[in-house]
Structures are given as structure tokens and as C-alpha cells.
Swiss-Prot record:
Cellular-component GO terms for this entry: cytosol; glycine cleavage complex
Functional description taken from the UniProt entry: The glycine cleavage system catalyzes the degradation of glycine. The P protein binds the alpha-amino group of glycine through its pyridoxal phosphate cofactor; CO(2) is released and the remaining methylamine moiety is then transferred to the lipoamide cofactor of the H protein.
Biological processes per GO annotation: glycine decarboxylation via glycine cleavage system
Protein name per Swiss-Prot or TrEMBL: Probable glycine dehydrogenase (decarboxylating) subunit 2
Quaternary structure and interacting proteins, as annotated: The glycine cleavage system is composed of four proteins: P, T, L and H. In this organism, the P 'protein' is a heterodimer of two subunits.
Pfam families documented for this protein: GcvP2_C, GDC-P
Gene Ontology molecular function: glycine binding; glycine dehydrogenase (decarboxylating) activity; pyridoxal phosphate binding
Gene field: gcvPB
EC number, UniProt record: 1.4.4.2
Protein family according to the UniProt entry: Belongs to the GcvP family. C-terminal subunit subfamily.
Length: 491
């Protein structure tokens, strides 16, 4: 039930009582409303109960196993939230002078240092407000590099068929023509086709390694050689960095620029469209093009580096200096784990993924790449079950909700039919994984005996299935309802 449907005329809260005591004569006439605002009228208790009830309907990392592939839904340590909320950080104004912000700047400077070491890059900018914005910045840096050399004919960006959708979008936004490169049946880039594609028009290639197929690109050194010999650059999408922390570094693989997703790899909160952070790191070729501001260190302490100190920078991406609360949480996470802890993140994320993959294979599910070891996530294809029983990946995803699990990513990557992309992350226990396996075993039995149970799932949620096509095509979003029967409170 909507909160508007609970509204009753003249029902008040303490806030209403306070507002009633205000003298409208103290407010200029041109600022006064002529009509009552379209706000629901409820008691404070009713409001509290309404939103508490809604909160109990949420799936979150704090309440459920969340194996959403390519999203790294790991636990966000509460210590990071607590320390990042200390008054000295919360009360600091974004435009506070550097001499009054030395502790804050020191944290950001040390975060820059740690992230450059983790990635094998030369320099990093923390200012990007999200992974997608960081990705756009990295591609813009590639464009700036070629243009600074007078190489305006490099208009093509190579993107694998298994890439995240943001990759071709970022390339197109920067004015590049996207050239899709295919993947082999074992999940690697097709080198022969890459050799044919790379040439004088190639600006670069955008890769995730491990890829969204859940396997490591084994020929990355040869890929880097082909692109660099053609005069192009390598962009690293940091979406799957969690799998290689402390083991492999993108800079050592030959990548020239990359972005990091702090909400994935470094345990800052997901959700709601922000706030986020997507730092951009670059090697020697591109570091001078990094967006500003960055934090520098001199004999007086720490200070902001702006366009004055970085004249080749692509400029600013946002107001102020990035989302400081998110950056502080990532800094605290890194300090809590240290080098050894980060290596264990990679080890346990890979261990959990491979354990889950093998157990599901033993149950009878079909792996998309049965001859490959999973990196941190893996894909099962339900095509044989769809063909035999008419049950789809969507049906299984909906049925998992009844068993208390968030569904994995479905139908992505697009080149694997009827797929589930499953990523357990390093923070889940073997017991949790075993419970998920038990649920998948029961679902497999249901597919073979009572497939209609899945076709009509979920059965234990307040909402069954939405018309997703209609919802996408006929957008009707507003903060208040338009039905007359729900507008009684404003009459």
C-alpha cells in the first residue's frame, strides 16, 4: 500500500503542530503557497510503521546472500562506516583551505599511493564520481593522447563481445567508432581477428580481465603487443579486479589506463545511484592527462593539484573533489586488510566461485566454459533445461527469491544463451554456499517434475511478476499518485 493511500485529512504529526504555530505574516507574500502541498497526512507512528514495513521487504547484503555476477556484492565492514563518519571528516567543508584539511588530504594521498601500487600504474585521480564516469574519463584520456600527437585518424575503439555495456557507450560518447571483437569458445579474445582488426585507425581496446565470462584472458600479453604495435592503447575496466588483488596488476599486463570500482573491489556501499567513486589510474603514456584535482605532497604538507600544476589534464569531472565519504571508506578498508589481506580477498573469492561452480556442475547444471577455472564468478547456461522443460533463466531467478536468495545476474553476457552469472565473493561462508547449492538442487528437481512452479514464481513475495516490457516502454514515474481516490487529502 502506498503511503498516500493511508492518508487521512487533518491527521497530524508533531511537525505539523510546529508548522501551525508559524506566522505566515513573517514570510513574503510572493513566497507563500496558494494550494496545499500534495503530501500525505499521517501520524508519526503510521509513518514509522510504513517505512519499517518497506525496509523488511528489501533484499540487501546485510540480510541475504547476493550472488549478483559482475557486481561483487561483498560485505561492507561497519568499521569503515564508523571511522569515515568521525566529526572531523563529516564537518569539513569541501572548499576548506588545504592547511585546514591536512588529515583529510593525507588520507587521500595515501589512498592514491596504495591504489597505484595495487594497479601497477604511475598516477591516479580519485575525483570520478562513479565507475562509469571513471571509464568515460579513461577513454577521454586516450582521445586526448592521440590528439596531442596530431593522430586524429585513430577513430576506432575495439570492444569484446562479452564487454560491459558501458564500454561501447563510453567509447561512443568520446566520439569513437566501436569495433566488436569476438571471443573464442574457451573465453579468450580471438587473436587472429584482433590482428586483422588492429591498424592505423585503432585508438585502443577496452578489456576486463578476468572477463565478464568469469575466466582470465590467458593471452593478454599478446593482446597488448598487437595493440601497442598498431599504435593503440589498452583500457582496463576494473569491474573484476577483486579476483586478482595482490596477484596480478593491470599495469604489468600492459594496460595504459583503467578505472576502479570502489563499490565492488574495496567494499564501499552499492546502491541508489550513488554516491560512488571510480578512480582513474594511468601509466606513463597517459598520466599527464588525468582529471583534476589530485592530491600532491610538498615540504609544507599536502595540497590540491589543479589545472595549473597539470596543464595537460582533461579537466574536472565534477564539482569539488570527488565523493570524500566513499573514498575514506575505501581507504579504511585497505588499511584494515593490508597487503596480505588483499591477497586473501583474491584467493577466497576465487575459491568460493570454483567450489560453487563444481558443486552445481555435479548437480547437473551446464557450465558455459567447462574446461576453464573460474576466476571470481562463473556462468551456467540453462539452454538444455529450456529445451527439455521450457523453463528459462528468468524462471530460476524468480524461484530463488522464494528460497531467500537474491537472483544472480541473468542474460548477461549476451553471447551465452539462458545464462546465470554467479559471483559469491570472498565474504560468504561455506555454509551459506551450501545452502544456495541445496536451493539450486531443489529447483532442479522442480524443473523436472513441476516446471509450472517455476514459471509462476515467485510465490512468497508481495509482488509476483511485473510486465517488464511495459514498464520499460511506458514510463510513468511520479512522486504522488494521480488517481482521484488517493488525492482526498489535498481537497
Amino acid at each position: 500500500m502506498l503511503i498516500f493511500e493511508k492518508s487521512r485529512k487533518n491527521r497530524r504529526t508533531l511537525a505539523h503542530a510546529i508548522a501551525d504555530k508559524m506566522d505566515a505574516n513573517d514570510i513574503p507574500a510572493n513566497l507563500l503557497r496558494h494550494d496545499a502541498p500534495r503530501l500525505p497526512e499521517l501520524s508519526e507512528l503510521e509513518v514509522v510503521r510504513h517505512f519499517t514495513r518497506l525496509s523488511r521487504q528489501n533484499f540487501s547484503i546485510d540480510t541475504h546472500f547476493y550472488p549478483l555476477g559482475s557486481c561483487t556484492m561483498k560485505y561492507n565492514p561497519r568499521a569503515a562506516n564508523r571511522l569515515a563518519s568521525l566529526p572531523g571528516y563529516l564537518k569539513r567543508h569541501p572548499l576548506s583551505p588545504a592547511p585546514q584539511s591536512q588529515a583529510f588530504l593525507q588520507c587521500l594521498y595515501e589512498l592514491q599511493t596504495m591504489l597505484t601500487e595495487i594497479t601497477g600504474m604511475e598516477k591516479i585521480s580519485l575525483t570520478s564520481m562513479a565507475g562509469a564516469q571513471g571509464e568515460f574519463a579513461g577513454v577521454a584520456m586516450i582521445k586526448a593522447y592521440h590528439e596531442s600527437r596530431g593522430d586524429y585518424d585513430r577513430t576506432e575503439m575495439i570492444v569484446p563481445d562479452a564487454a560491459h555495456g558501458t564500454n561501447p557507450a563510453s567509447a561512443a560518447m568520446c566520439g569513437f567508432t566501436v569495433k566488436e571483437i569476438s571471443t573464442t569458445k574457451d573465453g579468450d579474445i580471438d587473436l587472429e581477428k584482433l590482428r586483422q582488426m588492429a591498424g592505423a585507425k585503432t585508438a585502443g581496446i577496452m578489456l576486463t580481465n578476468p572477463s565478464t565470462l568469469g575466466v582470465f584472458e590467458r593471452q593478454i600479453s599478446e593482446v597488448a603487443k598487437i595493440i601497442h604495435n598498431a599504435g593503440g592503447l589498452l583500457y582496463y575496466d576494473g569491474a573484476n579486479l577483486n579476483a586478482i588483488l595482490g596477484k596480478y596488476r593491470p599495469g604489468d599486463m600492459g594496460f595504459d589506463v583503467m578505472h576502479l570500482n570502489l563499490h565492488k573491489t574495496f567494499a564501499t556501499p552499492h546502491g541508489g545511484g550513488g554516491p560512488g567513486a571510480g578512480p582513474v589510474a594511468a601509466g606513463p603514456r597517459l598520466s599527464k592527462f588525468l582529471p583534476v584535482p589530485m592530491v600532491g605532497k610538498n615540504k609544507e604538507g599536502y595540497d590540491w593539484l589543479t589545472e595549473k600544476e597539470c596543464p595537460k589534464s582533461i579537466g574536472r569531472l565534477s564539482a569539488f573533489m570527488g565523493n570524500s565519504g566513499v573514498l575514506l571508506r575505501a581507504y579504511i578498508y585497505l588499511r584494515l586488510l593490508g597487503k596480505e589481506g588483499l591477497s586473501r580477498v583474491a584467493e577466497f573469492s576465487t575459491l568460493n566461485a570454483n567450489y560453487l561452480m563444481k558443486r552445481l556442475e555435479q548437480l547437473g547444471f551446464t557450465l558455459a566454459f567447462p574446461n576453464r577455472r573460474a576466476s571470481h564468478e562463473f556462468i551456467i547456461t540453462l539452454k538444455p533445461l529450456t529445451r527439455a522443460y521450457g523453463v528459462t533463466a528468468l524462471d530460476i531467478a524468480k524461484r530463488l527469491l522464494d528460497y531467500g536468495f537474491h537472483a544472480p545476474t541473468i542474460y548477461f553476457p549476451l553471447l551465452v544463451p539462458e545464462c546465470l552469472l554467479i559471483e559469491p565473493t570472498e565474504t560468504e561462508s561455506k555454509q551459506t554456499l551450501d545452502h544456495f547449492i541445496e536451493a539450486m538442487e531443489k529447483i532442479l528437481t522442480e524443473i523436472k517434475t513441476t516446471p509450472d512452479l517455476l514459471r509462476n514464481a515467485p510465490h512468497q513475495q508481495l509482488i509476483n511478476r511485473l510486465d517488464e516490457v511495459k514498464a520499460a516502454r511506458e514510463l510513468d514515474l511520479r512522486w504522488y499518485p494521480i488517481a482521484k481516490e488517493t488525492e482526498i487529502f489535498i481537497q
